[in-house]
Amino acid sequence: MKFRKGRPKIPRLISEEPQFKLFKPAGTPGIELESEVLSFEELESLRLVDYLNQPHEEAADAMGISRRVFWNILKSARKKVADALINGKMIDIGGGYYKIRECNYEDECQRGRNCRYGVSNCLTLKKDSE
């Protein structure tokens, strides 16, 4: 019987599953390409830091994980994307250990009125100091 060491793994929070889950070099049939699998939480880390320009601390908080775990996820994601771009591999996005963040706060989920899940009553997140 195997026992897991350390703390139990908690699901990472993501804003939503991506609409597009496969990217490949143009002009080459997918069957001929190697693929690199990018998990949903790896894509979320790239989205928060590289696309939305959030500091690592804020991005880690948004995903509900420590900065160290966040950094490891981000480093893995960047390596996989770089490998796929440089070596002409297909990027397959899927899987991972995640949970979709509740859509109650516009500042957290950043969907607001454009929510693809049809939620139209997002509220602004109130800080403790307010």
UniProtKB/Swiss-Prot annotation:
Query: Any stretches that span the bilayer, and where are they?
Result: none
InterPro entries from the xrefs? UPF0251
Pfam families reported for this sequence: DUF134 (PF02001)
So which domain of life are we looking at?
A: Archaea
Q: Which family does it belong to?
A: Belongs to the UPF0251 family.
Provide the protein name: UPF0251 protein MmarC5_0986
